[in-house]
Amino acid sequence: MVRSIALCISIFLSSITAHAQLEELEKRAGLGNASGLTDSKVASGLKEALRVGAENSVKLTGKTDGYFKNEAIKILMPGNLRPLEKGLRAMGFGPKIDAFILSMNRSAEAAAPAAKKIFTDAILEMSFADARKILSGGDTAATDYFKSKTSERLTTAFRPFVEKTMSENGVMKQYKGLTEQYQSIPFAKSESFDVNKYVVEKALDGLFHELAEQEREIRKNPAARTTSLLKEVFGQSRK
């Protein structure tokens, strides 16, 4: 009899501990007054946050000047040419450099809308275990989830858009001209470089940067919670 009572007490205390741990996770995630919310509603709220953040980040990056006029994600000269940029500009190649940089950013802007479906698929695939990890993570935990689930697919999807736009804009010809000038400089090292790969990588970096900004806003700024579910799940801050 005593053993049965002890077992019941142990189970009861374990359930209290588990509940307290869940509440602490919700508090860390910036969720609102989550008491009374079911696990499925919390997961739905996180999925909704992902959807809103993903849609906003794709809109911001996939428009004209989405990359080019955003200094945080603007694609600059490749690393192998950047040290020589000042010298090349002094030699009169400024317009070519500017056209090259603009074309790289235009290619990224053309590719960005392809992320929407891939992000949507990743949201649909999210399990409650994934939601728990996001819940217990930091301000960009959802973005980190997207990175782990979509980076490979995004790279595959972005490459054709980048190659097509770069070809149409004559980027490879511009790049070849710049590298020839670079290689004509005494002691300059000639290195093989995949400019398409560079643009795809920088395009993804920019996309995830914007997604992280959107996630922070949803977690911390009530005005960014644009749906009733987001308002309910990410409601009043817990004290």
Predicted regions mapped to residue ranges:
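Positively charged n-region of N-terminal signal peptides that target proteins for export
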Residues: 1-4
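Bacterial N-terminal signal peptides
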Residues: 6-15
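Sec/Tat signal peptide C-region and signal peptidase I cleavage site
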Residues: 16-20
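N-terminal Sec/ER secretory leader and immediately downstream segment
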Residues: 23-101
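A cross-kingdom marker for long, charged
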Residues: 27-33, 203-239
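Residue-level signature of catalytic and energy-coupling elements of molecular machines
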Residues: 57, 127, 222
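Mid-length scaffold segments of soluble, non-membrane domains
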Residues: 93-165
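An amphipathic alpha-helical core segment
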Residues: 161-207
